[in-house]
């Protein structure tokens, strides 16, 4: 979320920047193949911020920068899930938090892994994801 907001501010978008950055990214026709910086299931996105600065200085289109950032976040999330699966097996997935209200990321993660997502309107708060998880757990106990 921090990367998305920082990028949005650099692009002149109003904070919080998630929805506006998503709309901007949808205007891009560029496709990025990103190799995330991973250590186990942990990722670092600081290099992405540096790349954003370089792309801004190079005059890249704002829509392409927005798409680059969301592609980077998607690659990191996919890398995290793959690392968890490699260590623990195919666990059920629950995606929650503000970033999960992004339809681009939701679609890519759902296509790759399935999982449970709260409706976008409820994804802006981690508490909604925790509530969904609690409901799923209570159904399993019945």
Locate the predicted segments by residue:
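A short helix-loop
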Residues: 2-63, 140-142
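Buried hydrophobic packing segments
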Residues: 7, 81, 130-135
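Adenine-nucleotide phosphate-binding core of ATP-dependent small-molecule kinases
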Residues: 40-46, 50-94
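Alpha-helix C-terminal capping segments
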Residues: 56, 84-85, 105-113
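Glycine-rich phosphate-binding loops at beta-strand->alpha-helix junctions
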Residues: 90-109
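Conserved phosphate-binding/catalytic loops in two-lobed NTP-binding clefts
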Residues: 93, 110-130
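C-terminal charged capping/lid subdomain of soluble metabolic enzymes
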Residues: 118, 136-142
């Amino acid at each position: 979320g921090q990367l998305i907001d920082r990028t949005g501010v650099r692009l002149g978008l109003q904070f919080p920047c998630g929805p506006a950055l998503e709309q901007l990214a949808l205007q891009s026709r560029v496709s990025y193949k990103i190799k995330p910086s991973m250590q186990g299931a942990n990722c670092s996105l600081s290099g992405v911020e540096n790349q954003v600065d370089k792309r801004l200085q190079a005059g890249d289109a704002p829509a392409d920068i927005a798409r680059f950032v969301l592609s980077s976040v998607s690659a990191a999330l996919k890398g995290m899930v793959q690392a968890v699966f490699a260590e623990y097996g195919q666990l059920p997935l629950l995606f929650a938090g503000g970033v999960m209200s992004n339809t681009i990321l939701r679609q890519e993660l759902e296509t790759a892994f399935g999982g449970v997502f709260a409706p976008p309107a409820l994804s802006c708060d981690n508490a909604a994801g925790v509530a969904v998880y609690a409901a799923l757990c209570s159904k399993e106990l019945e």
